[in-house]
Design a protein with these regions (language model features):
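Classical eukaryotic N-terminal signal peptides for Sec-dependent ER targeting/secretion
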Residues: 1-19
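Transmembrane alpha-helices of multi-pass eukaryotic membrane proteins
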Residues: 10-16, 293-307, 357-369, 389-406, ...
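Soluble extramembrane domains flanking the early transmembrane region of eukaryotic membrane proteins
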Residues: 14-17, 21-300
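Membrane-embedded alpha-helices of multi-pass membrane proteins, especially ion channels
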Residues: 20-31, 306-319, 369-385, 405-418, ...
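Interhelical loop segments of eukaryotic multi-pass membrane proteins
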Residues: 35-42, 318-344, 377, 384-396, ...
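Hydrophobic alpha-helical transmembrane segments
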Residues: 236-250, 339-349, 377-381, 406-409, ...
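Hydrophobic alpha-helical transmembrane segments corresponding to the first two to three helices
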Residues: 283-453, 485-486, 490
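Cytosolic juxtamembrane regulatory segments of multi-pass membrane proteins
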Residues: 337-351, 502-518, 594-597, 665
Length: 665
């Protein structure tokens, strides 16, 4: 009954936490970001601007992992007098490259079919012209998307999808392609005019609509932008005439034997929309994201199932152990105890130091560093500090925290290594500081070389790599040494029972208590509580969707913590009952095996992404495939250390507790 009450209380607490987090998530702009007011040109002053700056972010595609800067294409360029905005560390590492645009937008000054720059002419005999045109064709073939920013919010392309639902995409395509058989691809399906076989249609005109909330009736000056929408169009403008933005679409044949002239034009209109508040201006984007509503029900269903299973595991463990310990302590005969209690028989071997204790302690140190970093990052994300409106903040926060958390990594690694009886403290601290971070950086650097070779905007500049290395060597490494110093100065962790000099022979094990089957089974339940969130996280990374439901993610993090702990404890108990006392590595690998399921799911996502998400992943090309699996490997390694550390310390606590409450002669 007590166990049931504890489980019920835990469930209630978690559900209350969910409600609190969801309430906090409504305050999207609560911390750190202030609104900008805009006025007409005649009323402009320091706190009320008339010029609306339009910025261009990188162009990306769901069919390629290689993003490119706006200026990598032969589009109209911004004047050199315009300054490029400064990007933070997180933006650079994520591959964001924000540049000023050539578009001129003034508040409440509407523009109709204005030429953006001089026409672009591509001669069939010019190698430079054909290279520029071929690069544009590549962008249209792989459905590359523009990403524009106005007043720190994305310019969206809204269109109707299944069942008439309005979907607002924070990007719009460069153009589209009609195959040689006449089959329109991607955005070419929106119009029957796109019908020329084996032809590209470049979207060279945009209709931009800016919605604003006026402060005239609310006592504050000017107006605030609450929505920015764009409608791309393909128009074949008449040569040497003033553009009218009417006429057939601009068709570019696959063959480069014809002269192509491209004139880029734009229109801007303003709409007063006072029913949308500035603080909730992202709602129309977030609410239209694919499967947003389904995610609520799926996650709740998953959480209820996981909580139910966790409660059952907790009740079984508490009741079984309570009876075992009570009955054992009442027995006077050692023979009686040996008859019924397998886990008690190995008390003299259960704390025997593990093989490869050096490597295990290094894994635990790095895993602790990742665990604390993840917890703090998700906590700040729940409070709204790391929302999509605060660009690059999530990655910046994670990197800075990882650097500053070298001390607990060194301390845990040193303390556990000393507990294992290790004496090579120099090797331990060096491996803790360099082994896993070095492997991750080596993988990241190899991926960066590919991005450099492909001239992608996602390639991290050399200067930023130097900064990352400086943070690692000059901050993280010294802090790791400092933590290791304090760890080695402490006494080893005292075990509740003594270890025998002669190891006990382990009996023949049944199938489910052998190392491999137990390890494979141990990762199933933890993976079951994250795979729904994992789908949306992978969509955010590879399909360029916004991820903003950090409240759910934090709750899933807590459930993952509980599930990894309980699954590892349960299997550890079964192995001890089978008189197998080699639990150290098994505890780490049991929960760490969840990372193998993560890898399998990433492979499945790569090959069979759902076809009704409006962001179907269809990566093509050797470079993109290598990049996908290279970055996936980094994610899997980090997740392996994270989950393995959770399972190990849960099992370590469990074993210490149960052997601390029994009477040993």
């Amino acid at each position: 009954m007590a166990a049931a009450a504890v489980a019920a209380t835990a469930t209630t607490t978690l559900l209350l936490l969910l409600l609190c987090v969801l309430a906090l998530s409504q305050a999207f702009y609560l911390p750190g970001l202030a609104p900008v007011s805009f006025c007409e040109k005649a009323e402009e002053h320091l706190n009320c601007l008339s010029t609306i700056e339009l910025y261009m972010n990188r162009l990306d595609s769901v069919e390629s992992v290689l993003p490119y800067e706006y200026n990598a294409f032969d589009f109209c360029k911004a004047p050199e007098s315009k300054q490029r905005p400064t990007e933070n560390l997180g933006q650079v590492l994520f591959g964001e490259r924000i540049e000023p645009s050539p578009y001129k937008v003034t508040f409440k000054e509407e523009t109709a079919c204005a030429a953006l720059c001089e026409p672009k002419v591509y001669e069939p005999g010019s190698a430079v012209d054909q290279a520029n045109l071929d690069f544009l064709k590549k962008a249209m073939h792989f459905n590359y998307q523009h990403h524009w920013i106005v007043d720190n919010m994305p310019v969206t392309w809204c269109y109707h999808v299944d069942e008439g639902k309005l979907f607002c995409n924070p990007g719009f395509p460069v153009g589209c392609y009609v195959t040689a058989s006449g089959q329109p691809k991607d955005a070419c399906i929106i119009s029957t005019e796109f019908k020329e076989p084996d032809s590209f249609y470049l979207f060279n005109h945009v209709d931009v609509t800016l919605s604003y909330h006026s402060g005239a009736a609310e006592g504050w000056e000017g107006a605030r932008l609450v929505a920015a929408k764009v409608v791309p169009r393909s128009i074949k403008h008449a040569v040497n005439e003033k553009p009218t933005c009417t006429g057939p679409p601009l068709s570019i044949p696959q063959s480069g034997t014809e002269r192509v002239t491209v004139l880029y034009t734009y229109s801007v209109s303003f709409v007063e929309t006072n029913n949308i508040k500035w603080a909730s201006r992202w709602d129309y984007i977030l609410e239209s994201m694919p499967h947003t509503n389904i995610q609520w029900f799926s996650i709740m269903n998953s959480l209820v199932i996981v909580l139910f299973l966790s409660g059952m595991v907790a009740m079984i463990m508490l009741r079984t152990l309570h009876k075992d310990i009570a009955r054992y302590n009442q027995m006077d005969s050692v023979d009686e105890a040996q008859e019924e209690f397998g886990w008690k028989l190995v008390h003299g071997d259960v704390f025997r130091p593990p093989r490869k204790g050096m490597f295990l302690s290094v894994c635990l140190g790095s895993g602790t560093q990742i665990f604390i970093m993840t917890f703090i990052t998700l906590f700040f994300a729940c409070l709204g500090f790391l929302s999509p409106a605060n660009r690059g903040a999530l990655m910046t926060c994670a990197v800075v925290l990882w650097v500053l958390l070298g001390t607990p990594a060194g301390y845990v690694s040193a303390r556990m290594y000393k507990t294992f009886g290790g004496e090579k403290w120099k090797t331990n601290v060096i491996l803790t500081a360099f082994l896993w971070p070095g492997l991750v950086f080596a993988d990241f650097f190899m991926m960066n070389l590919i991005l450099w070779a492909e001239r992608s905007s996602a390639a991290v500049p050399f200067g930023t790599l130097v900064v990352v290395l400086a943070l690692w060597f000059c901050v993280s490494v010294p802090l790791t040494f400092l933590g290791a110093y304090f760890g080695f100065r402490r006494r080893p962790i005292e075990h509740p029972v003594r270890t025998n000099q002669i190891p006990r022979q382990i009996p023949v094990q049944s199938l489910y208590t052998r190392p491999l089957p137990g390890t494979v089974m141990g990762g199933v339940l933890p993976f079951g509580c994250i795979f729904i969130q994992l789908f949306f996280i992978l969509n955010s990374i590879w399909s360029h969707q916004m991820y903003y439901m950090f409240g759910f993610l934090f709750l899933v993090f807590i459930i993952l913590l509980i599930t990894c702990s309980e699954a590892t404890i349960l299997l550890c108990y079964f192995h001890l009952c089978a008189e197998d006392y080699h639990w150290w590595w098994r505890a780490f690998l049991t929960s760490g095996f969840t990372a193998v399921y993560l890898l399998a799911y990433a492979v499945h996502y790569f090959r069979h992404t759902e076809r009704h998400t409006h962001t179907k992943l269809a990566i093509e090309g050797v470079a993109s495939t290598i990049l996908y699996f290279g970055y996936t490997l980094i994610m899997v390694l980090i997740f392996f250390l994270f989950t393995g550390t959770i399972g190990f310390f849960a099992c370590f606590w469990f074993v210490t507790k149960i052997y601390g409450v029994v009477k040993v002669d």
